[in-house]
Design a protein with these regions (language model features):
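Conserved ABC ATPase "signature" region
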Residues: 125-142
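Conserved beta-strand-loop-alpha-helix hinge in the C-terminal portion
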Residues: 228-251
Length: 258
């Protein structure tokens, strides 16, 4: 009898609003960024999150990594409410790879090893883990001594992705992870992501506008528009041509159909 997938992540009517001007700290009228978002993520899912600019996609990932807190609603990781999980513990299970990579002045070697040190791995285990993922991502050894300023934008993005993969989290959150990579590297990364659950029991949620990549990647698609979850479909239910047209229209008006 086939084992039923477990619900790993659950959002219940999650909303998020910005309240403060970051520069003046003066109170501003509250404006909603995400509104009443509810969905479930099953273990091993590969979830694509797409929608027009300003839909709140990146903010959703920030909430899932607890870089921001919901204004309303609740998020659960394996039946534990997020606010009951220590932040350090949560981020060992849920890893966020941001769109803008920053190595914070560290060498590539230190940037990749640091999250593994936090996991209390031995030096040998760290070296083995780094070697494995560098080989998978085709990162050459001579990058290890380089700092952020000695890497191109695409190289920094690849190293940033490696930082997310080396800890082999339960859930990996990716924000436009291939936006500065060439076609061959992008295809290799999509292939790696598709095998993550089989090899490392990792669930993946990825924000991306490139529908050809999403078609190759996802088992489920979430479509956001104006901060609302407009559609939650299995990949087999998605009309990709209609979705492409919807994204084009959404940049200029509010029509929704796919």
């Amino acid at each position: 009898m086939e084992k039923k997938p477990q619900i790993q992540l659950k959002l219940e009517q999650v909303s998020y609003s910005e309240k403060l001007n970051a520069h003046t700290k003066h109170k501003l009228p509250e404006y909603p960024i995400l509104q009443d978002i509810s969905f479930e993520v099953y273990q091993g899912s590969r979830i694509a999150i797409t929608g027009p600019s300003g839909a709140g996609k990146s903010y959703l990932l920030r909430l899932l990594n607890r870089l921001s807190e919901p204004t309303n609603g609740k998020i659960y990781l394996e039946n534990r409410e997020y606010r009951q999980i220590p932040t350090i513990e949560l981020r060992q299970s849920v890893m966020f790879v941001a769109q803008e990579p920053k190595l914070l002045g560290m060498s590539v070697r230190d940037a990749l090893a640091y999250p593994l040190v936090l996991q209390n791995l031995s030096k040998l285990q760290i070296q083995q883990r780094l070697s494995y993922w560098m080989e998978q991502l085709h990162i050459p050894d001579d990058w290890l001594g380089r700092t952020e300023t000695q890497l191109s934008t695409g190289q920094r993005q690849l190293v940033n992705l490696a930082r997310g993969l080396v800890i082999q989290p339960k859930i990996l959150l990716l924000d436009e992870p291939t936006s500065n990579l060439d076609i061959a590297t992008t295809s290799r990364i999509v292939e790696i992501l598709n095998r993550l659950y089989e090899k490392h029991q990792t669930t993946v949620l990825m924000v991306n506008h490139q529908l050809d990549e999403l078609q190759m990647f996802c088992t489920q698609l979430l479509y956001l528009q104006q901060g609302r979850l407009m559609s939650n479909l299995l990949a087999s239910q998605v009309s990709w041509e209609n979705l492409q047209e919807t994204l084009k229209q959404a940049e200029t008006d509010d029509d929704f159909e796919f």
